Amino acid sequence: NQATDHPTHIALLAFEKYIEDRLGDKYNVEVYPSELLGSQTDMVQLTQTGAIDFCVASNSILETFSENYTLFNLPYLFASQDAYNAAMDDSEIVDPIFESTARAGFEAVTWIDAGTRNFYTVSTPIHTPADLKGLKIRVQQSPTNVEMMDRLGGSATPMGFGDVYTALQSKVIDGAENNEMALTSNGHGDVCRFYSYDMHQMIPDILIGNCAFLDELSEDERAIFEEGFQLVNLVEREEWGKAVDAAKEKAQNVQGVQFLYPDPKPFQEICEPMHEKVLSQYPDLRPIYQRIQECNAKYSPGTE
């Protein structure tokens, strides 16, 4: 569902070339950007049925197919970018989640970095949770995100991403939360003056594949596809870092966005009870959660 200059699309083009260079006599890869095949929900359903073989889906959509994906939506699940990368590269963490949708006809084949989600506002700088009080903040259409916003004192306003710019411009909402690229690629920085690095979520996008297609691959073919999936991850992460740097520079120097760096700890302390609530509801996730905490301990800010 991304434009052709987006890191995800660039990574999928690398996958296309890799597969066709090695298996082009049998497989022709076609990449469709910009929701040409429909919404993300439509594409997941098409992947389920085998009408298409792969698609990139957001974690919040996959949560409707498997409660295991609820874990990644938790605010302040990861202590740092390094902890996030280490956890997402750990098969003992991701495999039980990635394989949990097999009964629905698809499974995850790799993760895609979608950055860190932070608050940005039209006119109110966010330094502490108290600054969110009474502000109407657009959140993703997910119960987890609504609860997070309510706990932080803001007024959660779920809406589709395509409606956010107009809502900001017309002051229907006071702000939103997303990564830096929303400021530039989607023009939100033309309306919003402040972007606050509270670092509340690091949620991956997921490349999923149709199970029947994957099962029909020969052993050698599957090995080549697995290399291709790994390439998607590596290329996207590299491109993502460059894209975020460029977005931040444009937002600051062209759009006039002011970047703020509040202490995340007060935000984290307010949201922390959500972790135990989810683990009590889905106890099978607790061992995975504990392994993530090991990554957090190893890669927490300030540790060598």
Residue ranges of model-derived segments:
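N-terminal secretory/targeting leader peptides
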Residues: 1-84, 92, 101-304
